[in-house]
Each structure stands twice: as C-alpha cells, then as structure tokens.
C-alpha cells in the first residue's frame, strides 16, 4: 500500500481551481492520510509538502520535505526517486526565500 488513492485525491484537490471543487484543506487531508498509510513512500511527502506550501504552512512543508530528503538520500539508480528528491530540493529553496 502506497497511499495511492489518497495521494491521487490530494493532488487532484490541489490542482483543481476552487470553482471546480479544488480545496487546499481536502488536499492536505488526503495527503496526510497517504503519509499515514505509507510513511516511507517518498512521493506522499512531496505532495504533502506542496499542499502545505500552497497554504503558506511553511513549517509543516519544511518538515515533510526533510522527511522526503531523508527517504531519498541514497537513490542514485532510481529515476522516480531522484525526480521527487529534485522537486523537494527546489521547493526547499523556495522556502528559504519566503
């Protein structure tokens, strides 16, 4: 179990405009559930960090990003994990400027 359904719903709520049903709160809820169900799945932490960042919850975003970076510390051969790590590093840079 990777928390996939909750991750998908969380990403959907984050990407949809409000008038089409988008909701930052619903996004965070589903991504928190994905992390709860699969705390060692890096993509869940990236999505949750992005949702927190979108809500200006920078402390929680940083916490999720630190977990993501820890989970992807030695992943030189896995392209997906390298991509998640790179996205996380880019978001962390934004956090240091906000």
What are these regions (language model features)?
Residues 2-5, 44, 78:
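TPR alpha-solenoid repeat register
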Residues 11-21, 54-56, 76, 93:
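Short coil/turn linking the two alpha-helices of tandem helical-hairpin repeats
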């Amino acid at each position: 179990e990777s928390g996939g359904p909750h991750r998908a719903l969380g990403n959907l709520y984050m990407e949809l405009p409000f008038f089409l049903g988008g909701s930052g709160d619903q996004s965070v809820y589903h991504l928190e559930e994905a992390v709860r169900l699969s705390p060692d799945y890096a993509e869940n932490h990236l999505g949750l960090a992005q949702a927190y960042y979108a809500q200006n919850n920078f402390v929680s975003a940083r916490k999720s990003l630190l977990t993501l970076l820890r989970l992807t510390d030695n992943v030189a051969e896995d392209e997906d994990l390298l991509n998640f790590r790179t996205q996380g590093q880019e978001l962390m840079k934004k956090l240091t400027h906000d």
